[in-house]
């Protein structure tokens, strides 16, 4: 990619991001370095009951909460009387892709479908990509997952390569790149601009 191509895309950064999520982030600025999180959350417009219903549609959440009885007995046996917490484990592996990231992918993919986007794009090298791909498949959307996988010598990170295969198993197109800022400053913006997909990226 030429410097001019990068400049052309990054120069349209705000416009591309606005069209990829229908949010003008400037409305939420609070000073030079901060932004108004509470005001931002108001635009979600969903109650917790509605979010739970959306999650149930695609089998996200309601994961088991397991009390660790043996550990709790041990803690009580060595703690002063009346002390010693009860310890529970939340089994997020019971989510569709075996990760708590299914919860994070839930609403962006739902919003993309509700708003009529043809697909979603996310940049991630881990569990979030599989979660986005899985949710997109359930909602009938296309998905492109962009991964930073390779070092400068062309060696792929085994965990990221494996996550890429997981994304593909859910029907996503996986694009893999050498680690570097261009994935975020150019590749994602270019894809969003060219395809008109929803940006489900965390970054």
Predicted region positions:
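PLP-dependent amino-acid enzyme catalytic core
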Residues: 1-203
């Amino acid at each position: 990619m030429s410097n001019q191509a990068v400049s052309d895309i990054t120069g349209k950064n705000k416009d591309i991001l606005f069209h990829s999520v229908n949010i003008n982030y400037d409305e939420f600025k609070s000073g030079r370095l901060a932004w108004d999180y509470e005001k931002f959350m108001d635009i979600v417009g969903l109650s917790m009951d509605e979010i739970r219903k959306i999650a149930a549609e695609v089998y996200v959440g309601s994961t088991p909460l397991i009390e660790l009885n043996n550990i709790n007995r041990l803690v009580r046996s060595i703690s002063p009387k009346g002390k010693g917490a009860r310890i529970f484990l939340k089994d997020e592996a019971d989510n569709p892709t075996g990760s708590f990231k299914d919860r994070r992918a839930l609403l962006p993919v739902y919003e993309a479908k509700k708003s009529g986007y043809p697909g979603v794009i996310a940049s991630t090298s881990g569990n979030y990509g599989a979660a986005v791909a899985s949710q997109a498949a359930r909602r009938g959307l296309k998905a492109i997952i962009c991964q930073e996988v390779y070092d400068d010598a062309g060696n792929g990170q085994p965990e990221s390569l494996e996550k890429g295969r997981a994304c593909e198993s859910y029907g996503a197109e996986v694009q893999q790149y050498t680690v570097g800022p261009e994935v975020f400053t150019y590749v994602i913006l270019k894809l969003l601009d060219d395809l008109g997909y929803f940006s489900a990226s965390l970054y």
